[in-house]
């Protein structure tokens, strides 16, 4: 049975990757279908009710700069906002928001329902239709076939998902949802390497049974940050506190006593869990010298009594979970409303993907999110946007696009995955980016919005706002460079009290701002130097560009050197055994990874600069040197 309409792009899955993928393809004018097993769970926050953080906030800002929905939904759902690393340099500052689950889901669903070119349909997908190594559609659980030349799979943890609580386990995509068994079996027939990963979630606690007076209150920031470049503080709902408590030796003894019934430590779970978000069992085992671990007590929303205890993800049996929770200060009488659990699921080796997130073996088939071995809403959303965009570009007969490592954290994410692969759930950190001074949260729109407009991702309202911001920044920078103060100026007596060293020679306003003791806000408040920019984001940009100009310029010079051969393309059908001078190890690694560019090849472990030189000579001799997009 065939559906009565044909589509350009089909997106399978309605989580964070799927929603961004569907919205991106539709924004670009492609007739898009989003298939989900349950319309009510579109945009669901399956684990932690929070968006952003170190590295992750950078991804959210980049999604936003390209017209995505995640940051906007966070501004409407965020019940506590904080800027992490606020005392450090701008490269590692990151926005994090605690979100109301219900409000977030409602906003995402509202955005989806109002998106032109997007159809949403409730049906689980069981099969792919492939013809001559090209995807041509999907078949749902009830045998309904949908046709499209491009399909984006965002199956999350649903592929052969298995939920573990103690030594009990059952099939599930997440608590309360069925797994995708038939689709998982179909995907295992494809020539793509497959593995198993696991992730987990903590028990949810009834807030009415917690004694918050025994915990440390953690308030949000003042003034309140916003997540979206189009956001406003007025969009935020009521703001509330989170709380901090700690495990103790009694907690650790309870956990150790239950390890014989832990699926992780009894060999029941084979999948590898996230290194940077370990279960409490893992923490006790790996950090046995620590007598306590911090727990963030995070409300799940304004109209629910559920609390998310961030830091005690566990798959221990329920009785052990209850005892360990009640051993924690402030939770002596706590009641669990949902048990914690681990979930094991299929993922596919991202080295079998192009950097467009299209599979190398099946044309038109794109993967995004946890199916590629990542963990986190933000990582999923970034991949979804990229995959949806490239699916639309392909249907429109245009070249694929992916930002380079020096252009976006999205570029770092995709390059790491497609070049190096991953054996554990991959999480983004600022430390993964070698050019992080240029990849800041504050300039994500400056880096990406113009490209997003060119690709058709950015609407008129965002473009107008961005253009106005760019113009005001440029005009203010010109003003600061062109206005000067002389030692005998009447402004000097007003200015000198604010300086560590009094003015002794002619100086531009820009030079004054570059002084360590001066900032933009302070300078603009001094009579004769203001009023300056009213837009705080534009003002922040002016300050950073002036104060860090030397460092930024040096990093840009490094990038210019590095990209010389970065985009030199490598034929996917090149047999590296035919390249004279390469060692057997290098040949094996290159034939296994099949890198798309010289840049990707150079980042594969064990590939030496000498091997890269040999490759370049070989390509030149055979007239194969080409530059990719």
UniProtKB/Swiss-Prot annotation:
Residues binding NAD(+) are: 273-287
> Which keywords annotate this record?
Cytoplasm, FAD, Flavoprotein, NAD, tRNA processing
Which residues does the annotation say bind FAD? 13-18, 125, 180, 370
Coiled-coil intervals: none
The subcellular location is:
Cytoplasm
GO biological process, alphabetically ordered:
tRNA methylation; tRNA wobble uridine modification
Q: What is its main location?
A: cytoplasm
Q: Which GO terms describe its cellular component?
A: cytosol
What InterPro entries would the database entry show?
Answer: FAD/NAD-bd_sf, GIDA_C_N, MnmG, MnmG-rel, MnmG-rel_CS, MnmG_C, MnmG_C_subdom, MnmG_C_subdom_sf
Cofactor dependence is on: FAD
The terms under GO molecular function for this entry are: flavin adenine dinucleotide binding
Give yes or no: UniProt keyword Zinc-finger.
no
Subunit: Homodimer. Heterotetramer of two MnmE and two MnmG subunits.
UniProt similarity note: Belongs to the MnmG family.
Q: Function of this protein?
A: NAD-binding protein involved in the addition of a carboxymethylaminomethyl (cmnm) group at the wobble position (U34) of certain tRNAs, forming tRNA-cmnm(5)s(2)U34.
> What is this protein identified as?
tRNA uridine 5-carboxymethylaminomethyl modification enzyme MnmG
């Amino acid at each position: 049975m065939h559906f009565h309409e044909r589509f350009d792009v089909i997106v399978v899955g309605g989580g964070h990757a799927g929603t961004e993928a569907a919205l991106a393809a539709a924004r670009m004018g492609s007739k898009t279908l989003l298939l989900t097993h349950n319309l009510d769970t579109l945009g669901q926050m399956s684990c932690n009710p929070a968006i952003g953080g170190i590295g992750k906030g950078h991804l959210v800002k980049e999604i936003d700069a390209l017209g995505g929905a995640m940051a906007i939904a966070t501004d409407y759902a965020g019940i506590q906002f904080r800027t992490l690393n606020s005392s450090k340099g701008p490269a590692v500052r990151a926005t994090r928001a605690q979100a109301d689950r219900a409000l977030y889901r409602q906003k995402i669903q509202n955005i989806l329902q109002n998106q032109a070119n997007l159809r949403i349909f409730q049906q689980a997908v069981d099969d792919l239709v492939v013809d001559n190594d090209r995807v041509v559609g999907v078949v749902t659980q009830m045998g309904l076939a949908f046709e499209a030349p491009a399909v984006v799979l965002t199956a999350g943890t649903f592929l052969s998902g298995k939920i573990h609580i103690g030594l009990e386990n059952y099939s599930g995509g997440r608590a309360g949802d069925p797994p995708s068994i038939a689709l998982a079996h179909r995907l295992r027939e494809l020539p793509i390497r497959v593995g198993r990963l696991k992730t987990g979630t903590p028990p949810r606690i009834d807030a009415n049974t917690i004694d918050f007076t025994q915990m440390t209150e953690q308030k949000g920031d003042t003034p309140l940050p916003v997540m979206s470049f189009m956001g406003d503080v007025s969009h935020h709902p009521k703001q509330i506190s989170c709380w901090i408590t700690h495990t103790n030796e009694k907690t650790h003894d309870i956990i150790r006593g239950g390890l014989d019934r832990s699926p992780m430590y009894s060999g029941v779970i084979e999948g590898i869990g996230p290194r940077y978000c370990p279960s409490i069992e893992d923490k006790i085992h790996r950090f046995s010298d620590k007598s306590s671990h911090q727990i963030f007590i995070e409300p799940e929303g304004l109209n629910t009594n559920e609390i998310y205890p961030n830091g005690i993800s566990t798959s221990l049996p329920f009785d052990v979970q209850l005892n360990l929770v009640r051993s924690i200060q402030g939770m002596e009488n706590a009641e669990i409303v949902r048990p914690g659990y681990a979930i094991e699921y299929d993922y596919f080796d991202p080295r079998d993907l192009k950097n467009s997130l299209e599979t190398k073996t099946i044309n038109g088939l794109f993967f995004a999110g946890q199916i590629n071995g990542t963990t986190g809403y933000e990582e999923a959303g970034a991949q979804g946007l990229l995959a949806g965009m490239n699916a639309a570009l392909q249907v429109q007969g245009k070249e694929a696009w992916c930002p380079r490592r020096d252009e976006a954290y999205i570029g770092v994410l995709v390059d790491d995955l497609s070049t190096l692969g991953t054996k554990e759930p991959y999480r983004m950190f600022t430390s993964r980016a070698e050019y992080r001074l240029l990849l800041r949260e504050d300039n994500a729109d400056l880096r990406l919005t113009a490209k997003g407009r060119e690709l058709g991702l950015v609407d008129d309202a965002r473009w107008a706002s961005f253009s106005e911001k760019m113009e005001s920044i440029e005009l203010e920078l010109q003003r600061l460079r062109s206005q000067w103060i002389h030692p005998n100026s009447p402004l000097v007596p007003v200015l000198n009290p604010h300086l560590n060293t009094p003015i002794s020679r002619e100086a531009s306003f820009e030079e004054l701002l570059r002084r360590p003791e001066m900032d933009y806000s302070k300078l603009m408040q001094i009579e004769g130097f203001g009023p300056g920019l009213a837009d705080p984001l534009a003002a922040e940009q002016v300050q950073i560009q002036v104060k860090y100009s030397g460092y930024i310029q040096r990093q840009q010079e490094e990038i210019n050197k590095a990209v010389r051969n970065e985009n030199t393309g490598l034929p996917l059908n090149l047999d590296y055994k035919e390249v004279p001078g390469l060692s057997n190890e290098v040949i094996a690694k290159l034939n296994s990874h099949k890198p798309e560019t010289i840049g990707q090849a150079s980042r594969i472990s064990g590939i030496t600069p000498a091997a890269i030189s040999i490759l370049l000579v070989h390509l030149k001799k055979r007239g194969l040197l080409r530059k990719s997009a």
